[in-house]
Amino acid sequence: MEERKQKVVVVGAGPVGSLAALYAANRGHDVEIYELRGDLRDPSTTPLNFTRSINLALSERGLNAMRHANQPRLIDYVKGVTIPMRGRMIHGKRPDGKLYEEAQDYDIHGRSILAIDRGDLNKRLLDMLEEMPNVTFFFNHKLTGADFKRNKAWFENKDESTSNPRDRAREIEVDFDFMIGADGAHSAVRYHLMKFSRMDYQQEYIDTLWCEFQIAPSSSSAKSKFRISPNHLHIWPGKEFMFIAIPSNDGSFTCTLFAPAAIYEQLEEAGRTGDTSSSIPEFFDMHFPGVTSLIAPADLIAQFQTNPHLPLISIKCKPYHFSSSVVIVGDAAHAMVPFYGQGMNAGLEDVRILFDILDKHDRMTNDDSSLEASQRELALAEYSAVRVADAHAINDLALQNYIEMRSSVLSPVYRWRKALEEWLSVYVPSLGWQTKYSRVSFGNERYSEVVKKSERQGQVLLRSLVGGVGLPMLAGGLFLWFRYKGALGRAAYGVFYNCMGMVCRTIHGRRR
């Protein structure tokens, strides 16, 4: 659609910021992208989180956002570089000492999520933006100030270093019609937005650190370069920690150890003191059986000692905008822990929803610039109203999924509910029944609606279970009471009464 040209400033050149710039540029706006780091395509640039390889799970929401960017080459590229993961592969050890693998498909209909290298996707988006004449990059520029009432921002150019280290780099002033903040969890745009908007803000570091490891490609097999199945997200679950592995195109796997800070301290201390009984390989053999056959013990130690041990942050805030001048998206608005694989997907979806709402309000304007600004203000207010509830919902789901991944995947109750919901999805499709994971990862309905529907399904299953157990118990209790009215009958009725009480308390507790 043809729109009036505006100057859009995007702060942050990661995947979310780059997609936002692509959306804006496709609408004919003049786009300037400001990035704190150097060009992310330069190998010398320090990557996100100081790691070289971050594999992510790309699902329908992220793909849908890229489809709406009207860049068929982008979708073709994604199809060519991603690896489909159809489910989880749970690793463990049986009581007899034998190792096992157990596949758990994500979806009974055979749908998959895609493993993709974050850096490669980012580079591709930047390459596409560089081809557009109305896009300009400003790398090594730090946002130092903003006046969102006057639509002005100030950036420090770190490229122009001074001879005196105490002197500040040169600062430039930038005018804009509209700013999009996509500069991550520690967002400078959000920091300055708080000075203009009465923003509610909540930040939490969970008691879990993460460290990256690598499983190298196979050099001995002529059939496959992958040493374990490439079409699964591999999980070594533990009650308090877990180890995961995600495939890469070169045959390697990017692995992550998630564990409480106390565990990391113990392993670090063992490394310093040379305590072999609690060393890193012994820890892996005890809790993640089979990993030391995929990563040599010496490599495990080296990677643990070399790669950073990083925290996980969860952020909620509202609103996401001020007036008609600024909005935040992605981690700047809702940083979440990575356990649902939705962080990047939610950020990319932010962009699609934001521009859908902007387009809707743009159709209500004419050439009057003041009317244009007022409509954009209404659009940003609508975006905040719509998106906050969904962002908070997926933020909570991500925290809950950590428990599922590290322990519930082994639970018979978890497997029973998943199997029953999938059976209903296939054999009684008129009910519209789906697992929560399928709704989140393979659909585009609002996260908040997914939560509501999943809770309703859980209540129905619980009532059905209670009905299936409780009615036979009631019939049995009445039979015993009338058949044996003496002491035996009273004793049997007492057992029945207590059991029914437990069922009722279970229902009451679940509803709360």
UniProtKB/Swiss-Prot annotation:
It catalyses: L-kynurenine + NADPH + O2 + H(+) = 3-hydroxy-L-kynurenine + NADP(+) + H2O. It comes from Neurospora crassa (strain ATCC 24698 / 74-OR23-1A / CBS 708.71 / DSM 1257 / FGSC 987). One of its GO terms (cellular component) is mitochondrial outer membrane. InterPro entries: FAD-bd, FAD/NAD-bd_sf, Kynurenine_monooxygenase. Pathway: Cofactor biosynthesis; NAD(+) biosynthesis; quinolinate from L-kynurenine: step 1/3. Belongs to the aromatic-ring hydroxylase family. KMO subfamily. Keywords: FAD, Flavoprotein, Membrane, Mitochondrion, Mitochondrion outer membrane, Monooxygenase, NADP, Oxidoreductase, Pyridine nucleotide biosynthesis. Pfam families: FAD_binding_3. Its EC number is 1.14.13.9. This is Kynurenine 3-monooxygenase. GO terms for molecular function: FAD binding; kynurenine 3-monooxygenase activity. Catalyzes the hydroxylation of L-kynurenine (L-Kyn) to form 3-hydroxy-L-kynurenine (L-3OHKyn). Required for synthesis of quinolinic acid. The lineage of its organism: Eukaryota, Fungi, Dikarya, Ascomycota, Pezizomycotina. The gene is nic-3. It is found in: Mitochondrion outer membrane. The keyword rRNA-binding does not apply. Its cofactor is FAD. Gene3D superfamilies: FAD/NAD(P)-binding domain. PANTHER family: KYNURENINE 3-MONOOXYGENASE (PTHR46028:SF2). GO terms for biological process: 'de novo' NAD biosynthetic process from L-tryptophan; anthranilate metabolic process; kynurenine metabolic process; L-tryptophan catabolic process; quinolinate biosynthetic process.
